[in-house]
Amino acid sequence: PCRNVVTKPVQKPQPPMWMACTNRATIKVAASIGVGALAFSFVDPEEARAWAEIYYDIIKSDACVPIGHAVNANMAMVSNFSVHQDQAEAIRRGQEGFEFFSYAVNALVAHDALPGRSTLFEDFQKSRARSDEEIIAATKAAARNANGIGTPDDIRQHIEGFRDAGVDQVIFLQQAGRNRHEHICASLELFAAEVMGEFKAEVAEREAKKAAELAPWIEAAMARKPWMQPLPDDQIPV
């Protein structure tokens, strides 16, 4: 219905709607109401592929009944992020902060964390399974490190995995724990210089192909949408 929107976005059309998703069940809900799925769980590309298939299978079915005035058919995945030419240094700069973010989110949801009283970071450090140096050693021993924390080549493979799995966008988590501002800026600069360009070059063609493929499904979904009747002036919420 009509309502007073605060703050008032300048963008026209209005910014697309997204829903935070943490598991397959919430992915299904997002697709069924035609909103973007912001996957706030740190999953690997194989699990991401399963989520993308679930999401787009529903978008392309009668089960999609849009809640808004448009369908935002997109899936975004949150990812860890720390880039350095030295893989070990990337881990030292970003791994602990990323792990702490995951720990803190779980603690705030699953436990009664009290501001100014709970000792989340100290508790996290006591419970941490492996040190940075142990993770560095394991990473060096691995045949492949497609990861958001590593060298430009590592993160390139990481993004390629999500792209090939059907993920539309990747959101990099950076400001967490004791991650330093200058390290975050250095990671972003290196990413922009050595990785981002090749993916940006693909965007227009990939988005056009996707839009053409989804157009009949989105048109059918909008035709199923039950539209509300206009409210009398005295019933418009303010």
Where are the model-predicted features located?
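A local structural motif
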Residues: 9-16, 142
